[in-house]
């Protein structure tokens, strides 16, 4: 897993990894999470010598990378959508070239995962979910477009999370409208 807080917080609960192992019991799967909360598709905040000793993506040679981007970038609003798409294209090219699979040295398989929706909190100090979700939908659509251009698998978790949030209002799935709690993590994993 590579990307932002949505993926990074999957480390807290383990639902996704458990369901994957349960589904593919006959496979020897290893799931590693290299997501960081502030990561964006074009910005990964690391010290300049972060990979000097050991680059984790290179060390573990992923066959498949699930990419979780779009939420942080969505704060740029509609004006940032084109830049987001271009940065995604660039990132995919860099990952394909820099991190070949261990078994064949071919490019890893990629799965682009859309950003999740925002759950309404009722807190006047936090963004209104309806407004944020319009912005997020644009970035979901942009990620889908990049995936289609590249023939890459795309998973739309935006619609699923938005529907779940609407069905059970009142911060049932997040701690603050955008970071999933355990129930939200389980819902996303399923």
What positions do the PLM features span?
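Alpha-helical cap/lid subdomain in secreted, periplasmic
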Residues: 14-32, 39-190
């Amino acid at each position: 897993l590579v990307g932002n807080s949505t993926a990074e917080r999957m480390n807290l609960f383990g639902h996704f990894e458990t369901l994957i192992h349960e589904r593919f019991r006959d496979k020897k799967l290893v799931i590693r999470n290299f997501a960081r909360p502030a990561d964006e598709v074009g910005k990964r905040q690391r010290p300049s010598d972060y990979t000097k000793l050991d680059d984790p993506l290179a060390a573990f040679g992923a066959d498949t990378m699930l990419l979780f981007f779009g939420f942080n970038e969505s704060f740029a609003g509609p004006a940032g959508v084109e830049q987001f798409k271009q940065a995604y294209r660039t990132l995919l090219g860099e990952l394909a070239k820099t991190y070949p699979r261990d078994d064949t040295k071919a490019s890893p398989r990629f799965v682009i995962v859309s950003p999740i929706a925002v759950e309404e909190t009722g807190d006047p100090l936090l963004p209104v979910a309806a407004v944020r979700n319009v912005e997020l939908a644009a970035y979901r659509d942009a990620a889908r477009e990049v995936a289609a251009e590249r023939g890459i698998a795309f998973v739309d978790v935006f619609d699923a999370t938005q529907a779940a949030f609407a069905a059970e209002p009142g911060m049932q799935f997040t701690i603050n409208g955008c970071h999933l709690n355990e129930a939200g993590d389980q819902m996303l994993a399923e």
